[in-house]
Amino acid sequence: MSKQLLLGDEAIAQAALDAGLSGVYAYPGTPSTEITEYIQMAPITTEQNIHNRWCANEKTAMEAALGMSFVGKRALVCMKHVGMNVAADCFVNSAITGVKGGLIVIAADDPSMHSSQNEQDSRFYGDFSLIPMYEPSNQQEAYDMVYNGFEFSEKTGEPILMRMVTRLAHSRSGVERKEQKPQNGISFSEDPRQFILLPGNARKRYKALLARQDEFIKASEESPYNKYTDGPNKKLGIIACGIGYNYLMENYPEGCEYPVLKIGQYPLPKKQLLQLVESCDEILVLEDGQPFVEKHLKGYLGIGIKVKGRLDGTLSQDGELNPDSVARAVGKENKSEFGIPSVVEMRPPALCEGCGHRDMYITLTEVLKEEYPSHKVFSDIGCYTLGANAPFNAINSCVDMGASITMAKGAADGGLHPSVAVIGDSTFTHSGMNGLLDCVNENANVVIVISDNETTAMTGGQDSAGTGRIESICIGLGVDPAHIRVVVPLKKNHEEMRQIIREEIEYNGVSVIIPRRECIQTLARKKRSK
C-alpha cells in the first residue's frame, strides 16, 4: 500500500478508516481533535457513510461508540486525557460488558499541560479497568496498533485503550498503509445478557474479566510492540515506554549499550521484565507522564533491585520527557539543550481582536468593579478563560468543564453576592446543563453568562451542540424566560449590556445572560472561502 506523511493523530484516523471503521465519536480537545477532523474530511467517510459527528461530551461519545459495538460494528472514540474523567462511568463498565464489534478508545494525554488543567496519565484508567492498552512510540506504531487493534478487541471481547501524548499526536512521519478492510455487518452477541449489568450478571462478568488477566499478560509478552534488546553493559537496564523509546534511540542512533525493554502494550509483560531485572544492577524507567510503570515495578514483581525514574528524582516528577532529559538520566553528555532562546519574546495566548468575549468582559468587569466590589466571577474551559489575563483580569476560577455554574451556585449558597458564572455555548451543552438545573431547582441567586460564539472555538471551530438553541435549552431546564437576556456584544450595545447586567444581578433568582456573536475566526474563514 501507499506511504503517507501523517501526524500521529492522522495516522490513527487513517488506520481506523483502513480497518473498516463504521463510526467515530468524540468531543474536541487538544491534542486529540485532529483524529476526528481527518476522518470527517476523508472522501471514504462520505462514500461509505461512516458516522462522524461531534458529540455533546465524552460520556455520550463513549456510550454511542459502545452502542455501535453492540451491533457488531467497529467504532473509535477520541478524547483528551481529562475527557476520560467524563467518560469514565461508561468506560469502566464497558470493560465488564465487553464488546461485540471492535472498540478502540483514544486518550490523548498532555504532559507539561500545553493546553490542559492537569497532566493526568490515562494508563491508570486502563489499569484499574483491567483491559489491554497500547502506547505507541511513533506514528507507524500508532497506525499499526489501531489497524490491528480492532481485531484484537474483537478477539478479546474487550475495548482497547490507546494512550497518545502531545508530541506524538502533533508531529509527522512517514506511515505505510495496509489494505482497506470492509466494514462489519450487523451482528449481535450470543449472550443476550452481555450488556445488562444487573448486580448478579455484573458479578459474573467481572469474575470472568479477572480470570482473563493472565491471557492479557500473555498477549503482551507475545506482542510485537514489546521488545527486549540486549546490551553489553548490565549496570543499567532501561524500560522505555511509548515515545520515551524514541527519545532513548535518539541518544543511541547506533544502538544502546544497555539492555532495553521497549513497552508499547499493557499489561506489563512479566517474562521480559524478569529477564531485564535478573540481568541488570539497576533499572531506569523512561515514561512520558506519571510514574505508572515505575510504581508497578516496585511492587509488581516483588523485586529488591533499585528502580530509577521520576520517583527518585532521576527524572523530573512533572513535565514531559525530551531527548535531553533522557540523555541526562542515562549519564550522557548533552550536545544541545532544548529551550527557548532568550531573544524570543513570550507570546501568551490572548482573546482575538474583534472577539465577542472581549466586549462581554469589558462590560461585565466595568459594572462589577464600579458597583459590586464584593463580586466573584467563576469561569470555565474555553477561549473566554483568557479573561484571566490582562487587560481584563476578569475571572476568579477555572477548574473543569461545567464548574463555573456549580461553583457559582455553591458560592451563592454560602452567601456571596453577586455570584457570576461565565461559560461558553459548547461547554454549557457539554457539562453545564446539570448545574443550571441544580440552580433552578433551588432558585439559586446566580447570574450565568453563556457567552455564545456559535462554535467550539478553542479547539478550531468545531460544531457546537447547542448552536441556535441555548435559550430553548434554558427554558426547558426551568429558567424564567423573563430572565433569559440575549445581547449582541458590540461597543454600540455597551450601555444596553451594562443595564442588563445590573438588572439581572439585582434579581433574586437564576438569571441567564447570553452575549451572542459569531466567532471572529469562523467569520474570517467563511469570508476566505467565498
Task: Give each language-model segment a name.
Residues 1-13, 17-19, 136-351, 356-357, ...:
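Flexible, low-complexity linker and terminal segments
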Residues 1-139, 167, 257, 292, 386-512, 520-528, ...:
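Thiamine diphosphate
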Residues 31, 82-83, 108-111, 138-140, ...:
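Short, glycine-/Ser/Thr-/acidic-enriched flexible segments
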Residues 40-45, 249-260, 472-480:
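Short helix-loop-beta junction
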Residues 46-55, 97-108, 188-194, 441-454, ...:
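A glycine-rich helix N-cap at a beta->alpha junction
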Residues 78-79, 104-108, 161-167, 239-240, ...:
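Short beta-strand segments
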Residues 87, 114-116, 170-173, 246-250, ...:
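Short helix/loop capping segments that flank catalytic or ligand/cofactor-binding pockets
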